[in-house]
């Protein structure tokens, strides 16, 4: 006889007017997350979630679509001001921040938190096409 599984309860996240915008932009994808002031995620989106595949995922347009989807949900829940934390070397960093600002959420600060190695791992070799 199969065991009955209980569906996990959805957490209730407290949304106040101030929050955080996290933009993670890699060479292959872009992930946009909006969190409350304590760091609990309110909404998130990515270029892959928006239906982009392959090399189209790391474009400014894909970042714009992901940020628009994420910002609309958070704005409806009551988020109005954010600090933007940007991480990674990808293309759509500025595009995502502009889109969130255009959706009615005020961006008060932009902070670059890209991790920089102090000569750690060897980088991948150059492509020869």
Swiss-Prot record:
Q: Which residues form the signal peptide?
A: none
Is Nucleotide-binding included in the keywords of this UniProt record?
no
GO biological process terms, semicolon-separated: translation
- Any one GO molecular-function label of the UniProt entry: structural constituent of ribosome
Coiled-coil positions? none
- Tell me the domain of life: Bacteria
Q: List the record's Gene Ontology CC terms alphabetically.
A: ribonucleoprotein complex; ribosome
InterPro entries per the UniProt record, alphabetical: Ribosomal_uS11, Ribosomal_uS11_bac-type, Ribosomal_uS11_CS, Ribosomal_uS11_sf
Q: Which UniProt keywords apply?
A: Ribonucleoprotein, Ribosomal protein, RNA-binding, rRNA-binding
Q: Which Pfam families match?
A: Ribosomal_S11 (PF00411)
UniProt function note: Located on the platform of the 30S subunit, it bridges several disparate RNA helices of the 16S rRNA. Forms part of the Shine-Dalgarno cleft in the 70S ribosome.
Q: Which PANTHER family match?
A: 40S RIBOSOMAL PROTEIN S14/30S RIBOSOMAL PROTEIN S11 (PTHR11759)
Subunit and interaction comment:
Part of the 30S ribosomal subunit. Interacts with proteins S7 and S18. Binds to IF-3.
- Family membership: Belongs to the universal ribosomal protein uS11 family.
What name does this protein carry?
A: Small ribosomal subunit protein uS11
Q: Which organism is it from?
A: Phocaeicola vulgatus (strain ATCC 8482 / DSM 1447 / JCM 5826 / CCUG 4940 / NBRC 14291 / NCTC 11154) (Bacteroides vulgatus)
In the UniProt record, the gene name given for this protein reads rpsK
